[in-house]
Amino acid sequence: MQVEIWSDIMCPFCYIGKRRFEKAMATFEGSADIEVIWKSYQLDPNQEDVPGKSINQYLAERKGWTVDYAREMNKYVTDMAAGEGLVYDMDRAVVANSFNAHRIIQMAKAIGKGDLAEET
């Protein structure tokens, strides 16, 4: 069976979902028969190419939130990630266009390293 996973590496929920999927696969008896195919997806293809603002500023502007509310939401995401063994530092995260990162992932996929590239 093939499982296609559409993911944007800029999305913190995608990485959390990847971890949860891996945990589920580890307990699934037929996991050896499953081929995971990573597909690139950009949440915001129009995002500027040069990182220029914090994730909290970006979310406040994009969603109409206050920066404090965005920070609270990112604390929730950080806690969710920690529950999956991931360490997020959302105060240091910046928003950037992920197109080139997806290109690198697809190049890595061509040499059998797509899953590893999704992690870095």
Predicted regions and their residues:
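Short active-site neighborhood of thiol/selenol oxidoreductases, capturing the structured segment around
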Residues: 1-12, 17-21, 36-39
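Structural alpha/beta surface segment adjacent to cysteine/selenocysteine redox centers
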Residues: 19-120
